[in-house]
Amino acid sequence: MTDSQASADLESHLASELRRVIDEAAVRDLASRYCWAIDRLDRAAFDTVFLPDATAVLGQGEERGIEEIWAKVDLVLSPLTCSQHLVGSHVVEVDGDTATHRCQFHAQHVMKGCEGGDQYIVAGTYEDRVERTAAGWRIRHRDLTVLWTSGNPLVARR
């Protein structure tokens, strides 16, 4: 192998690795943007996270389309005094223009004056199928799995 071939191979490898790192960061960013959007009840921001025809299992049943997904989020979170969703332990696997993503979440829900206590914590995992679009990465499907809860479940019963 000549020096120019080795240099070209290295350049190609570095470009591929850079693309992978950028893609993985963009997919991880979706989870954070989702948290910010739902905690602020920011529909415009929410629309930059999911595909219009996305699906999601956020509890019982499957929500079909971004309108149903938003309606479910709004139903649960809009009555609250506040909520704070945190994500971590991300694992991203990119395959061309599709990816899988999983992470853990910790969600604090607060409703001041709720009988039985004003806080409810839900912790679990998000597992996503994600697609690259002209506008960037978007979630095609999300599965939410609850691993544990603490506090007053009446806070988030809607």
Where are these regions (language model features)?
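Short, low-complexity N-terminal intrinsically disordered segments enriched in polar/charged residues
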Residues: 1-36, 40, 48
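Short, surface-exposed loop/helix-turn segments at secondary-structure junctions
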Residues: 113-120, 155-157
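C-terminal-biased regions
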Residues: 9, 13, 84-89, 108, ...
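A solvent-exposed, acidic/Ser-Thr-rich amphipathic alpha-helical stretch
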Residues: 43-107
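Transmembrane beta-barrel outer-membrane domains
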Residues: 25, 80-83, 119-121
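Short, surface-exposed coil-to-beta transition loops
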Residues: 85-87, 121-126
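Beta-strand elements of well-folded, non-transmembrane domains
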Residues: 107-111, 130
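Short beta-strand edge/turn micro-motifs at domain boundaries
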Residues: 2-5, 100, 123-153
